[in-house]
Amino acid sequence: RDVERSRGLGDVYKRQPHDVAGLIRLMGGEKKFVSRLDTLFSMALPRKYYEKNEDIAEVSLVGGYVHGNEPSHHIPYLYAWTSQPWKTQYWLRTVMNRMYKNDIDGLGGNDDCGQMSAWYILSSMGFYPVCPGTDQYVLGAPYLPYMKVMLENGKTFEVKADKVSDKNRYVKSVKLNGKPYTKGFITQQDIMDGGTLTFEMTSSPNKKRVFNGTDRPYSLSSN
């Protein structure tokens, strides 16, 4: 017999990073999609469901979201396909605060192929490749006020978020090379061209900042 291991609600969001718009439709629309995603992060998961599972430890959980299970790493970014991308910004910082510490249990899972570390570095810069088969990095929110990438072509790519903090975790606006930027993603070429990605941070969600049309990240069924 074929055997498939499943982790319930988290697996629903794990399987389709290439077509989030299609998944939203299959789940009955944005309202239901967001509601179930909210539940994943906020639910109380009884210990009996993971205490004998070698891949899941309490330190790796945010609700029912298992950050220690690397194929789930794109899930906090899925709000970018909805009218509530600010929730990505909230949960990213929550995950980084809980899962990455300078302590004996400071990593919320084993670092398979360096993925736990790679997620942290990219998410600290404010973006992540939700669908690696494309050239897009979906925007979240930086964790650090300044990061600089030295590119192999001799150029540099900088990320600035001067006021970012646990309180100021929300993105008010974004600029790319000094110009207002409305897309929910940047591309590999944007990075390789060099330049500066600037995030204006605030303590309250900017609920008017949503991504529609071509500003929304890639989905197979809508591209």
Regions found by a protein language model. Give the residues of each.
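Acidic/His metal-coordination segments adjacent to aromatic residues that form catalytic metal sites
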Residues: R1, N53, Y100-N102
